[in-house]
């Protein structure tokens, strides 16, 4: 029962993390222009993995998609690949988890389901690591430019998508670890105490002993009468 409960908790935590990681891809605010050192702000610049936008003081936004993948900076291409890999791994981890959980009717025997659940945990951990690496790489680029005194272009701050990605990655890793530890509970063999033999023997001696006594007494009496 404890193993089933831990698997359900791990599944809910992992799915929540995967949903958060998936929501970072369409999120606009991966980085937002800083207002540090500016007196008058006429526009706000922000960008994600797919486009760069600017919002003026009236609230009108103009966006421009990145024209060519090969013309992009290397860190953006790496973040794209890592985040897409994280979402894909989380999807397959969810499928493996459904087959490996003991509360489901698919997956075969308990031993086979335990192995599938452990595999789901490993996949979720990899998904979390990919998301954590992608968000950290993007954040490292932002902070490096922000604290560089020789960088004269527009400086940015960390956007909300990075924090969502870090939170989702942490949940995926935690859920994956719980899935991996659940296999140890499934491999534990229960101990049985056998007390039936003593009770059976005592009952046999109780009921059959009297019958043997009754059947032997007439024969002894007959032998005595035969010699009189």
Swiss-Prot record:
Keyword Glycoprotein: no
Effect of residue 131 to L: In HELIX; strongly reduced localization at the plasma membrane
Extracellular topological domain: 22-80, 137-160
Keyword set, alphabetical order: Cell junction, Cell membrane, Disease variant, Ichthyosis, Ion transport, Membrane, Tight junction, Transmembrane, Transmembrane helix, Transport
Cross-referenced PROSITE patterns: CLAUDIN
Gene3D superfamilies: 1.20.140.150
Catalytic activity annotation: NH4(+)(in) = NH4(+)(out); methylamine(out) = methylamine(in)
Cytoplasmic side: 102-115, 182-228
GO biological process: one example: paracellular transport
A Pfam family annotated for this UniProt entry: PMP22_Claudin
Transmembrane segments annotated in the record for this chain: 1-21, 81-101, 116-136, 161-181
MF GO annotations: identical protein binding; paracellular tight junction channel activity; structural molecule activity
GO cellular component, one term: bicellular tight junction
Family per similarity comment: Belongs to the claudin family.
Function: Forms paracellular channels: polymerizes in tight junction strands with cation- and anion-selective channels through the strands, conveying epithelial permeability in a process known as paracellular tight junction permeability.
Comment block on domains: The fourth transmembrane region (161-181) is necessary for integration into tight junctions.
Subunit structure, interactors included: Can form homodimers both in trans (interaction between CLDN10 molecules in opposing membranes) and in cis (interaction between CLDN10 molecules within one membrane).
Protein name: Claudin-10
Organism (species): Homo sapiens
Underlying gene: CLDN10
């Amino acid at each position: 029962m404890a193993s089933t409960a831990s698997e359900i908790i791990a599944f809910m935590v992992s799915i929540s993390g995967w949903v958060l990681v998936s929501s970072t891809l369409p999120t606009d605010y991966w980085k937002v222009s800083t207002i540090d050192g500016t007196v008058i702000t006429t526009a706000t610049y922000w960008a994600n993995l797919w486009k760069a936008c600017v919002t003026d003081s009236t609230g009108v936004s103009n966006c421009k998609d990145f024209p060519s993948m090969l013309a992009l900076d290397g860190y953006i291409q790496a973040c794209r690949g890592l985040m897409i890999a994280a979402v894909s791994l989380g999807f397959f981890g969810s499928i493996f988890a459904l087959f490996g959980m003991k509360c489901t009717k698919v997956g075969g025997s308990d031993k086979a389901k335990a192995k599938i659940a452990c595999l789901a945990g490993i996949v979720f951990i990899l998904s979390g690591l990919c998301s954590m690496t992608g968000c950290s790489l993007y954040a490292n680029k932002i902070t490096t430019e922000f604290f560089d005194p020789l960088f004269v272009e527009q400086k940015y701050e960390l956007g909300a998508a990075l924090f969502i990605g870090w939170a989702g990655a942490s949940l995926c890793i935690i859920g994956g670890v719980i899935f991996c530890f659940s296999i140890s509970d499934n491999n534990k063999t229960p101990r049985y105490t056998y007390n039936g033999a003593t009770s059976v023997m005592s009952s046999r001696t109780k009921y059959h002993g009297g019958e043997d006594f009754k059947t032997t007494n007439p024969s002894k009496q007959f032998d005595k009468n035969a010699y009189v």
